[in-house]
Amino acid sequence: KMRDAIRCVGHKGTMPTMEFLFRLDQTVNMHGEKTTELVLRKVADKVAARAGLDLVDFSVYPNVDHHPARYEYLFEFYHADHAAIDLAELSRITDEELRAGNYDVSYMTEDGTFAPAIARVLQDETNQLWRDMRVMHGKAPNQIKPVHIVDTEQKRRFFFALIDGEIEG
């Protein structure tokens, strides 16, 4: 009933050890566009593939404080040369893939309801640090879900503090 996507990461005897990947029915809905987490994931995977980077994980911040509102992708890449990443090009690809993934977002960007999506790059190990902090606060490691939608101020402060300032545009 929880609608979580899980992956078996091992066994303890005959009992499988599960890792939560994401909640299946989480959505971003700033202006009625209803972008699902599955669409957000597909966009992240396509952006990484097009940029030739290995994606560790991603988060999306639906920034309603920016005028007009916009999607802000926070990417963590595996052993990427951050100095070689063209942030403007990464943002362009991200916006293009998001528009292709959700036609409402495309239409609303064209009519000015949304600003084009942007991309930011997180420091290495950001997502592991989030997991470690949750464990330190008493959460069971196998119950911690990756943060794909930044939906609280605590998550926003954490992830935005770990944006790689060397390539910030």
Task: Give each language-model segment a name.
Residues 1-169:
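AMP-binding adenylation
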